[in-house]
């Protein structure tokens, strides 16, 4: 086992994000971490990577295991060049092996000016340089927080192929369902402070989570039925003198104290404004540029009610 987590808890102020979470990682495992926004996914990754300490429990990395971690917001210190940043901290032997790989990966991620200072990079370029760094360095475990951020479609497809072929262990958070579907073999969902694991990819996760929720609902229906029956008995005013009556009263109180399945957080988008007709946005001949560079020219578009349109294109082409 490369990495093990036992009964880990983590809180920020009065808010408990992780409560008694356990997790393991074997060689070759590829795990996707999912959950609603704010559930604690990135917190879990930081604990796995050693970037934060748990409030309780243990996180254990086997001796000699090398790990690389991509945070959501990488921070670069100093004025190193792009290539220096990617190879930072490597010994001579690892550096010579990693440099060719680093140049190849940077090119695939759209970063070709290796001698440029990292201080002059845009936010998207910094993310791609940080991603190249964790991919190029020799390691046994990759921990990636939103690795597809700031990647165009071709870059995402390349990264997908790269991670599918990679032989090490992988833990990642991503909101890209299809990326998860094609790469991971185990899903772990952070929910209400707990971690639920499911063998299989995203589609298998959906099936198995539905089965788990139905089992929870069935258990709750059974609990409610027993409570109703026991309530009727309690209302008859039994005495607690006898051992059996006392034990039954204790079981009733314990059953009543249990909580049923919590309401699950959901994302709900609700357009409240009324609209007349089907047309919502119309653009005619729109042109936009920055500093002499035209990114949109003579753009025509009509957006109708209920349209669903995806905007794709290379980085810097003008999508945003």
Model-inferred region functions:
Residues 1-221, 265, 269-320:
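ABC ATP-binding cassette signature C-motif
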Residues 208-251, 255-262:
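Intracellular alpha-helical coupling/juxtamembrane segments of multi-pass membrane proteins
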């Amino acid at each position: 086992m490369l990495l093990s987590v036992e009964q880990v808890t983590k809180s920020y102020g009065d808010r408990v994000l992780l409560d008694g979470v356990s997790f393991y990682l074997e060689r070759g495992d590829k795990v996707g971490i999912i959950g609603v926004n704010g559930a604690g996914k990135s917190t879990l990754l930081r604990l796995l990577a050693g970037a934060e300490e748990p409030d309780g429990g243990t996180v254990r990395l086997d001796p000699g295991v090398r790990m690389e971690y991509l945070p959501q917001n990488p921070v670069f210190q100093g004025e190193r060049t792009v290539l220096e940043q990617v190879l930072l901290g490597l010994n001579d032997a690892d550096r010579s092996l990693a440099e060719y790989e680093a140049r190849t990966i940077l090119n695939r991620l759209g970063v070709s000016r290796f001698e440029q200072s990292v201080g002059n990079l845009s936010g998207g370029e910094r993310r791609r340089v940080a991603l190249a760094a964790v991919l190029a360095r020799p390691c046994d475990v990759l921990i990636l927080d939103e690795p597809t951020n700031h990647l165009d479609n071709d870059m995402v497809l390349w990264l997908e192929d790269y991670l599918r072929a990679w032989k090490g262990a992988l833990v990642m958070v991503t909101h890209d369902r299809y990326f998860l579907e094609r790469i991971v073999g185990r899903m772990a969902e952070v929910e209400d402070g707990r971690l639920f694991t499911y063998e299989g990819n995203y589609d298998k996760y959906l099936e198995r989570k539905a089965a788990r929720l139905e089992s929870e609902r069935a258990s709750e229906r059974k609990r409610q039925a027993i409570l109703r029956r026991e309530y009727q008995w309690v209302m008859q005013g039994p005495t607690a003198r006898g051992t059996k009556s006392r034990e039954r009263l204790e079981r009733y109180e314990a059953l009543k104290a249990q909580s049923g399945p919590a309401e699950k957080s959901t994302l709900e988008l609700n357009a409240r404004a009324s609209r007349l007709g089907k047309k919502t946005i119309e653009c005619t001949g729109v042109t936009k540029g920055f500093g002499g560079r035209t990114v949109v020219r003579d753009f025509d578009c009509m957006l109708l009610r209920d349209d669903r349109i995806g905007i794709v294109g290379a980085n810097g082409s003008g999508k945003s």
